[in-house]
């Protein structure tokens, strides 16, 4: 239901895209949503990339095809792991922050104050978060994808002394343009889910400050689960369309 609600709210926030004051608020949200999640997302990508290279390399070495680790890492992170790792990191860091912020505004009746002042709470509070997430999450996904691929290079550099130039030449040979479009679409969908779930959970806060803490926990759990479900659906659809086929 949160995903449908997110799609329903997009027309409501589109008129405010051109307003300078919203862009200023959106830049602040970029720092909160993207920059603050970068260390965790980058470390996760490096760790998972190295482990994936290590495990796949152990099997491929038996067939004398250790250099094929490049293809495994490049395709896995470009199509799947980069966007998913980023979304999970942003979900844990930002869904809770959004839920806590909005929930506190509800408890302290700031939302009602905005309505009394003649301001649309959705335009004032939700639009900057959407803009910040839709801009930042794809950029963060690109950085995490690079971190994961670079971890594969570190493994092969120590294993078979593969040079930086050779490694990344093979990376660009393995990656197709449709793989890039696939991860961009995924990152935009994931950003929408994370912001919408955090916002809705914050709006549902009732009672005292304890309710805000519960809402943040629920926001992280729901957003992470919905991101994984959306990833499965998107990957399945693109597979049926032939976008995930080799060649």
Where are the language model's segments positioned?
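Hydrophobic core segments of alpha-helical transmembrane domains in multi-pass membrane transport
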Residues: 48-49, 190-199, 227-235
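Short cytoplasmic-facing helical segments at TM-TM junctions of multi-pass membrane proteins
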Residues: 101-127, 208-212
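Hydrophobic alpha-helical transmembrane segments of multi-pass membrane transport proteins
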Residues: 69-108, 112, 197
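Short, membrane-interfacial amphipathic segments enriched in basic
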Residues: 1-25, 201-206
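Membrane-interfacial helix-loop-helix connectors in multipass membrane proteins
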Residues: 54-79, 145-188, 192, 196-218, ...
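Active-site cofactor/substrate anionic-group-binding motifs, chiefly glycine-
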Residues: 25, 29-85
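Hydrophobic alpha-helical segments embedded in or immediately adjacent to the lipid bilayer
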Residues: 83-86, 92, 96, 131-166
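Selective transmembrane-helix segments that form parts of the transport pathway or gating/packing helices
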Residues: 34, 38, 42, 81, ...
């Amino acid at each position: 239901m949160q995903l449908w609600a997110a799609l329903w709210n997009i027309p409501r926030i589109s008129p405010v895209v051109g307003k300078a004051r919203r862009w200023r608020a959106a830049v602040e949200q970029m720092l909160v949503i993207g920059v603050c999640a970068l260390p965790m997302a980058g470390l996760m990508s490096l760790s998972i990339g190295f482990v994936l290279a290590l495990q796949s390399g152990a099997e491929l070495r038996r067939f004398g095809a250790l250099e094929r680790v490049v293809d495994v890492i490049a395709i896995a992170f470009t199509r799947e792991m980069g966007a998913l790792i980023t979304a999970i990191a942003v979900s844990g860091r930002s869904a809770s922050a959004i839920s806590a912020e909005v929930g506190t505004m509800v408890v302290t009746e700031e939302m009602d104050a905005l309505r009394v002042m003649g301001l649309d709470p959705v335009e004032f509070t939700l639009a900057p978060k959407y803009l910040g997430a839709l801009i930042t999450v794809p950029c963060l996904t690109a950085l995490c994808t690079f971190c994961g691929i670079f971890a594969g290079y570190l493994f092969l550099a120590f294993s078979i002394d593969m040079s930086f130039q050779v490694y990344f030449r093979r990376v660009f040979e393995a990656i197709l343009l449709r793989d890039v479009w696939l991860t961009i679409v995924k990152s935009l969908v994931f950003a929408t889910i994370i912001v919408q779930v955090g916002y809705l959970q914050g709006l549902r806060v009732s009672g005292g400050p304890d309710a805000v803490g519960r809402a943040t926990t629920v926001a992280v759990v729901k957003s992470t689960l919905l991101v994984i479900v959306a990833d499965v659906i998107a990957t399945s659809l693109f597979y049926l369309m032939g976008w995930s086929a080799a060649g």
